[in-house]
């Protein structure tokens, strides 16, 4: 089964940071969807894509500005349901004859409450059962006059046209973001939309597996693939999937860059050689990486150095096996959106990612990224589909640059050893308390400061470290984990007593946003 066997929903991306969450919510409903940037959606594209429904994403622009993003007018002539979200509502209203105005005292950012107005359309089945709905707003401009044919079905204090619809054409538009978790009943709205559009929910991880295998075979042909295997869930699922697709045409390379956790290198090599029978080259390049990182403290510089050296190593290993045509990576959606908009649209860059921003434009191999359109929980579901053990699939994410981005400032061997030991104690504590599976990601960061302490009768002047643990569904947003004081106190005591070089332990309670999950 390929993607063309499915009815497809088109998401037109206007640059919102949460466009990928729209796709995530639809995938939870087993609906096949694709995200495409507005500038790529032409009349010819629409005719070829033939969507069964269309969603307009939000975005940072103002429809009032000249040359603001907009879809082709022909999208409204397709005869399919359309849902506009935030900026998507505003562009729909303006293009269909309504009016949008600048927000002067009417902007809404954050939690808001929408109350119903008029009869309840099918889109709102299951809504307003308690009289109002909590939603997440993020808009400066606002609709001041709805387009002909539209009616109002929900209002908020600063958005009198919070929910509008033209029921004759199945056009719907909302000012809020139903895709984020801060709109608790948002999933119900999407369920209603895809149901009225006629989707049957036939897209599953089994279907994705078959589709991905077919696409890998079509892309690779008779070529050789070298896979960047880190031992993390992402690269491991990618490796097993690619191996299922092309067998011995795949060679995995595990690079020990000297930035791995305690005992990690040997565990990875043993696991994949003995249990998964994958062709594996173990390249210990500790000296190469640490020498290149010596004296570097800027996080972007560190990421770029690591990314470049990864490519250098893979190209060298490819030559050793007689040449490779493709480089495989376990790149995911959040990796890409945090580097630059996945769609190439106007989304704002947050940070470069080692799988993306660190790659030279003219590398010697083409990329194979079979997980590029998946979120972490989908990768785990795919791993289960591929037969990987649950204990492995449930491992916390670990970044490609490894401990380099958990060591703010300059990287030294002594600091890395301290960090490894502290991290091992912390994770042991989390497992001891039975909390590992409740947490999305947990780690220790060693801080670039020393603090004065007293141990016994002596003065110490050692490093401080920060514990980090977050809960998340998809990595796009995250909250800190609410450990008990007992846990934090016991963990701090263990680290200070068992890890030479640390005399102060802190706990990072920053959510994402405004912070990111990793320190760098």
From Swiss-Prot:
Give the reactions, separated by semicolons, that this protein catalyses: XMP + L-glutamine + ATP + H2O = GMP + L-glutamate + AMP + diphosphate + 2 H(+)
Enzyme Commission code: 6.3.5.2
**Binding residue positions for ATP:** 230-236
Catalytic residue list: 86, 177, 179
Cite the PROSITE patterns for this sequence: GATASE_TYPE_1, GMPS_ATP_PPASE
Q: Which GO terms describe its cellular component?
A: cytosol
Q: Identify the residues that the record assigns to the GMPS ATP-PPase domain, covering every copy.
A: 203-395
Q: Where is the Glutamine amidotransferase type-1 domain?
A: 8-202
Please state the pathway this protein functions in, per its UniProt record: Purine metabolism; GMP biosynthesis; GMP from XMP (L-Gln route): step 1/1
Record GO terms (molecular function): ATP binding; GMP synthase activity
Q: Which principal EC class is assigned to this enzyme? A: ligase
Against Gene3D superfamilies, the record matches this protein to: 3.30.300.10, 3.40.50.880, HUPs
Q: Sorted alphabetically, which keywords does the UniProt record give?
A: ATP-binding, Glutamine amidotransferase, GMP biosynthesis, Ligase, Nucleotide-binding, Purine biosynthesis
- Give the Pfam families listed for this entry: GATase, GMP_synt_C, tRNA_Me_trans
Source domain of life? Bacteria
How does it associate, per the subunit comment? Homodimer.
What does the record give as the function of this protein?
A: Catalyzes the synthesis of GMP from XMP.
State what protein this is by name.
GMP synthase [glutamine-hydrolyzing]
Task: Identify the species of origin.
Answer: Dinoroseobacter shibae (strain DSM 16493 / NCIMB 14021 / DFL 12)
């Amino acid at each position: 089964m390929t993607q063309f066997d499915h009815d497809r929903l088109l998401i037109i991306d206007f640059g919102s940071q949460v466009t990928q969450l729209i796709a995530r919510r639809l995938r939870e409903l087993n609906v096949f969807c694709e995200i495409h940037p507005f500038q790529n959606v032409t009349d010819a594209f629409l005719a070829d894509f033939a969507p069964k429904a269309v969603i307009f994403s939000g975005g940072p622009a103002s429809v009032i500005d000249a040359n603001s993003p907009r879809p082709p007018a022909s999208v409204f002539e397709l005869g399919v349901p359309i849902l506009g979200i935030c900026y998507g509502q505003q562009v729909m209203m303006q293009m269909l004859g309504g009016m949008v105005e600048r927000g002067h005292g009417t902007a809404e950012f954050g939690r808001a409450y929408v109350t119903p107005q008029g009869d309840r359309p099918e889109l709102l089945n299951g809504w307003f059962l308690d009289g109002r709905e909590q939603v997440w707003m993020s808009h400066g401009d606002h609709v001041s006059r709805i387009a002909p044919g539209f009616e109002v079905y929900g209002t908020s204090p600063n958005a009198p046209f919070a929910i509008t619809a033209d029921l004759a054409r199945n056009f719907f538009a909302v000012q809020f973001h139903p895709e984020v978790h801060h709109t608790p009943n948002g999933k119900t709205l999407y369920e209603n939309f895809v149901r009225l559009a006629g989707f049957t929910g036939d897209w599953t991880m089994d279907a994705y597996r078959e589709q991905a295998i077919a696409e890998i075979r079509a892309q690779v042909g008779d070529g050789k693939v070298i896979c960047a295997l880190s031992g993390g869930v992402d690269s491991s699922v990618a490796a097993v999937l690619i191996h299922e697709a092309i067998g011995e045409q795949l060679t995995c390379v595990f690079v020990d860059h000297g930035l791995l956790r305690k005992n990690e290198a040997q565990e990875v090599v043993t696991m994949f050689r003995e249990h998964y029978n994958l062709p594996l080259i173990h390249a210990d390049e500790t000296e190469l990486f640490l020498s290149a990182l010596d004296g570097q403290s800027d996080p972007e510089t560190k990421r770029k150095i690591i990314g470049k050296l990864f490519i250098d190593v893979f190209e060298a290993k490819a030559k050793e096996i007689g040449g490779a045509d493709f480089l495989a990576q376990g790149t995911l959606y959040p990796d890409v959106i945090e580097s630059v908009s996945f769609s190439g649209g106007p989304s704002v860059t947050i940070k470069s990612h080692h799988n993306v921003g660190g790659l030279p434009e003219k590398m010697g191999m083409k990329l194979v990224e079979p997980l590029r359109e998946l979120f972490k929980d989908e990768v785990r579901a795919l791993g289960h589909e591929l037969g990987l053990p649950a204990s492995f699939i449930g491992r916390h994410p670990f970044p490609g640059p490894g401990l380099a981005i958990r060591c703010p400032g300059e990287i030294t061997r002594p600091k890395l050893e301290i960090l490894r030991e502290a991290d091992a104690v912390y994770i042991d504590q989390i497992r001891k308390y039975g909390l590992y599976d409740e947490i999305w990601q947990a780690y220790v960061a060693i801080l670039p400061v020393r603090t004065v302490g007293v141990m016994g009768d002596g003065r110490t002047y050692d490093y401080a470290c920060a514990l980090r643990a977050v809960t998340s569904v998809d990595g796009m947003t995250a909250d800190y984990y609410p450990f008990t004081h007992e846990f934090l106190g016991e963990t701090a005591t263990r680290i200070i007593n068992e890890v030479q070089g640390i005399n102060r332990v802190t706990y990072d309670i920053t959510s994402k946003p405004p912070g990111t999950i990793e320190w760098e």
